[in-house]
């Protein structure tokens, strides 16, 4: 059994159960001659059990025959950090003094466990440091150990 020839990849962040033919999904898939309605239906079915509106990074593989497959990744670390810190957006200032909220080290560890499949490490301590770095760049103070 031979594999299909890959035409290209499309990277999008799509809200759970919120795939519609509207931009950015429609134009991105239309350029590659992919059946937009079929993708939207398949994606919405695959994300049915998830909380509505969670941003999901998705990699769509488009094949030469215009068929497709897709892989849904875990939500961005910033989504989890904002949720744990109970804020709607990160700091707009570039200075480290602009703290907009706080998260605990335990929160960062929990987020790291959730994000483990998408991080480039298998070590939980390193993953936690990655999440703490994301928190700092968003203007969140990490308290605890």
Swiss-Prot record:
PROSITE patterns: RIBOSOMAL_L11. GO terms for molecular function: large ribosomal subunit rRNA binding; structural constituent of ribosome. Keywords: Methylation, Ribonucleoprotein, Ribosomal protein, RNA-binding, rRNA-binding. Signal peptide: none annotated. InterPro entries: Ribosomal_uL11, Ribosomal_uL11_bac-typ, Ribosomal_uL11_C, Ribosomal_uL11_C_sf, Ribosomal_uL11_CS, Ribosomal_uL11_N, Ribosomal_uL11_N_sf. GO terms for cellular component: cytosolic large ribosomal subunit. It holds the Pfam family Ribosomal_L11_N. CDD domains: Ribosomal_L11 (cd00349). One or more lysine residues are methylated. GO terms for biological process: translation. Belongs to the universal ribosomal protein uL11 family. Part of the ribosomal stalk of the 50S ribosomal subunit. Interacts with L10 and the large rRNA to form the base of the stalk. L10 forms an elongated spine to which L12 dimers bind in a sequential fashion forming a multimeric L10(L12)X complex. Forms part of the ribosomal stalk which helps the ribosome interact with GTP-bound translation factors. NCBIfam families: L11_bact (TIGR01632). This is Large ribosomal subunit protein uL11.
